[in-house]
């Protein structure tokens, strides 16, 4: 099964009550909100971490815009490539055919170590920028 927004406590309760470990845990994950602890937990337990809203709130960051201009790419392509090179599953939402095509056109270039480090540095302490409800506050 797949779950969304499950923190370690939720995953442990699920396993204890159903003897089930999900295959995928979909969480908000961007360069600004990297969710280190959650990803580490998922990895340790064989759960794939999938990012929802993988590009939200980050496309106007000067670092992203600068890299996009230097590499002849869109800011979204830069962020999606960062996810790929970090070994993350990122599924951006779009209904625009041109944007969908751009989002898929990220496999013919790479970000160098310096670019990755600059994007990593966009992390916001404490996960500020979260959108949507906190999982601990949904259904008790």
What are these regions (language model features)?
Residues 2-140:
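Beta/alpha (TIM)-barrel catalytic core signal, keyed to glycine-rich beta->alpha loops juxtaposed to Asp/Glu
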């Amino acid at each position: 099964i797949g779950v969304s927004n499950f923190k370690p406590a939720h995953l442990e309760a699920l396993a204890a009550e159903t003897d089930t470990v999900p295959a995928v845990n979909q969480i908000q994950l961007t360069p600004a909100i990297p969710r280190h602890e959650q990803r580490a937990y998922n990895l340790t337990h064989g759960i794939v971490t999938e990012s929802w809203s993988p590009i939200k709130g980050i496309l106007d960051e000067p670092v992203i815009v600068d890299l996009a201009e230097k590499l002849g790419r869109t800011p979204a392509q830069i962020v999606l490539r960062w996810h790929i090179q970090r070994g993350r599953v990122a599924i951006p939402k779009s209904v625009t055919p041109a944007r969908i095509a751009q989002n898929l056109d990220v496999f013919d270039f790479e970000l160098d170590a310096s670019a990755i480090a600059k994007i990593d540095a966009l992390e916001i302490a404490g996960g500020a920028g979260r959108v949507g409800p906190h999982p601990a506050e949904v259904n008790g």
